[in-house]
Amino acid sequence: MFKGVSPINVDAKGRMAMPAKYRERLKDLCEGRLVLTVDFGGCLMLFPEPEWEQLEQKLARLPDLNPKARSLKRLLMGHASDCELDGHGRILLPSVLREYAGLDKRIVLVGQGNKFEIWDEETWNGSRDAWLAEVAAGEGVLPEELETLSF
């Protein structure tokens, strides 16, 4: 559904313009209603509202007596912020979430199928280079589901 890497500028009010190639799809999919929350990798995750609602239902079913499950719910649901594309195709990135991900003027929007990741551009470039080096060096263990993947 969503793919590609798009460098974007954040304006002085903390807004980012959604690339034009995604705007129509988002209007059709969710009328421009999105949910933004934290990711454990130091970036933000941006979900179309229907995708977020599915995740939220899964999170709600996690047992509150399990400390890890409760922490996950606190982080993802507690930081969740409703966003809507304005008439110019922009969304406001709340200051608390911009601060969490270290977002300033230059960010990168990364399509991840059913959602987007939003990274500080410098952090993205460093992480991407590290991931490429890991793959080239054959480091890490692939999950069983990926062992037969070929391209």
Residue positions per predicted region:
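A positional/architectural concept
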Residues: F2-L44, E49-P50
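Short, charged/polar, Gly/Pro-enriched secondary-structure boundary elements
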Residues: R25, Q54-L55, W124-R128
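Short, structured motif recognition centered on aromatic/hydrophobic residues
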Residues: G14-M18, F47, G89-L93, L97, ...
